[in-house]
Amino acid sequence: MIGLLKEYSDCFAWNYTEMPGLSREIVEHRLPIKSGFRPFKQRARTFRPDLLPRIKDEIHRLLEADFIRPCRYAEWVSNIVPVEKKESGKLRVCIDFCNLNRATPKDEYPMPIADTLINNASGNRIISFLDGNAGYNQIFMAEEDASKTAFICPGFIGLFE
């Protein structure tokens, strides 16, 4: 496996800046809001003080890669949820879009259930998994919907979309 990774290393992104994203002419993600839903701003959460510098570093990496941008005003505001990886201790900054998710229509074609996929793979000698870390950053958000993805960061880091 290591040999394959080395041989095809140019096929993988090893940091955020190596992920240029798809062209807007090919695909853009839109966030329609169901009727009857009003914009919602979550109250800012507090975090352990030792996490704040690591959150700030991750936000700066996302800014440098142009995955996010500062936002001056947004009607929809969500909180970040910092998640520490058990094995590596690496911090992943997730966003709590629970209010926005309730307001958007459900997909007509939902993702398959993980257990079903694993059961269907039984009998094979090798099963591999890929971590799609930051994969959602590869599809641009339609400009008119970008502010709906706004999130607030603790410690006066700011508001981003």
Locate predicted features.
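Retroelement reverse transcriptase polymerase core
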Residues: M1-E161
